[in-house]
Amino acid sequence: MDKKASRIRRATRARRKIAELGATRLVVHRTPRHVYAQVIAANGSEVIAAASTVEKAIREQVKYTGNIDAAKAVGKAVAERALEKGVTVVAFDRSGFQYHGRVAALADSAREAGLKF
């Protein structure tokens, strides 16, 4: 099993558990160059809020889009957008990525901005 298949297996297992809870989830995806975050409704069919380093507003705030500072900016932005829509409690879906570095930084900044998980 290669690295990507292992990550997808971990992500699938976590998503199944979150689906059983029936919770709105904060999904994180990272690539070497960008960080993406979405708040997805409990039914899985609606994206309530989203933010990424691809967006011009966030890209202008940071020096480089693939580092911890960029992840913090994305976490803050997605949390503010979710709170505007009335979402305060989410389950954190790290998409099989290790809770470390950019993933942890995004989670911490989303918590500081007001999301609870």
UniProtKB/Swiss-Prot annotation:
The keyword RNA-binding applies. The keyword Ligase does not apply. Pfam families: Ribosomal_L18p. Disulfide bonds: none annotated. One of its GO terms (biological process) is translation. GO terms for molecular function: 5S rRNA binding; structural constituent of ribosome. One of its GO terms (cellular component) is cytosolic large ribosomal subunit. Keywords: Ribonucleoprotein, Ribosomal protein, RNA-binding, rRNA-binding. CDD domains: Ribosomal_L18_L5e. InterPro entries: Ribosomal_uL18_bac-type, Ribosomal_uL18_bac/euk. Belongs to the universal ribosomal protein uL18 family. Part of the 50S ribosomal subunit; part of the 5S rRNA/L5/L18/L25 subcomplex. Contacts the 5S and 23S rRNAs. This is one of the proteins that bind and probably mediate the attachment of the 5S RNA into the large ribosomal subunit, where it forms part of the central protuberance. This is Large ribosomal subunit protein uL18. It comes from Vibrio cholerae serotype O1 (strain ATCC 39315 / El Tor Inaba N16961). The gene is rplR.
